[in-house]
């Protein structure tokens, strides 16, 4: 989570890459406090930044982040835009609280720091193709194309208009491996 921990993991992964380049695909979970140097290292090494936008629930004024990190460090958390613009691969997930991926997309597109907000498309891509890549499943999951699993949801409304309301959209249908497993239509 913290900047020192991220640096320590980057050091270890970079050592591993020197010993056996290309042998592994690494990721770091909870990349919440990456500084500029760490973001640059993530981009250069191809290490995936696995982050949980729903953690921004704690980012509000007088929230958990501010109570534990202080205002200055809180302002440096969850730098999604900086990471994406630097070429870092993003993988989004929930980490168990709250689990709803639409809430996480909402958090990524309405982040308290306007400079770190992603577009709906970028956030959805991090939850789908980015997560599949991080889990070594990009050949089966994360996109809808011939030869991949047909796992997807149909939403009641467009998540793009308005993006700020995405967490209020209901799921109309869920399809897993091409079979409808939930249908609220």
Regions found by a protein language model. Give the residues of each.
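Short, Lys/Arg- and Gly-enriched loop/turn segments at beta-strand edges
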Residues: 159-165
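Short acidic loop-to-helix transition motifs that present clustered carboxylates
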Residues: 33-35
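Short, compositionally biased
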Residues: 165-174
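His/Asp/Glu-enriched, well-ordered alpha-helical/loop segment
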Residues: 4-26, 30-31, 40, 47-159, ...
